[in-house]
Amino acid sequence: GLGDVYKRQIYHDYDEYSRELGWVLKPAFWHKGYADEMTDLLTALARREGKNAVIECVPEQTASAHIARRHGFSYEGRADGCDVYRLRCEK
């Protein structure tokens, strides 16, 4: 199940128009496409809800930033020490 791969999935309100999405993978599952899969699933959920999708990561999380950019998220700046990437997908 998902618990075998993910320590945690993140999906909650970020602001009135957006949902923050993310994941924490168990190290044995890094670099195997699971973060891409979760990004696709959660982005589709945000889109169905008519919301934008946001990924926040600390600057050292270069893999997360790469995934955000690869999935079409745009860098918006830094908030509370995290880089903020947003994908506009509201209806």
Which residues are covered by each model-predicted region?
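A short, internal acetyl-CoA/4′-phosphopantetheine-binding micro-motif in the GNAT/acyltransferase core
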Residues: 15, 20-32, 58
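Conserved donor-binding loop and adjoining core beta-sheet/short helix segment
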Residues: 7-16
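Short, small-residue-biased leader/transition segments that mark boundaries at the very start
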Residues: 1-6
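Conserved acetyl-CoA-binding loop of GNAT-fold acetyltransferases
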Residues: 69-79
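Conserved acetyl-CoA-binding loop-helix of GNAT-fold acetyltransferases
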Residues: 23, 31-46, 65-70
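C-terminal "cap" of GNAT-fold acetyltransferases
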Residues: 19, 78-91
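Conserved GNAT acetyl-CoA-binding A-motif
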Residues: 48-57
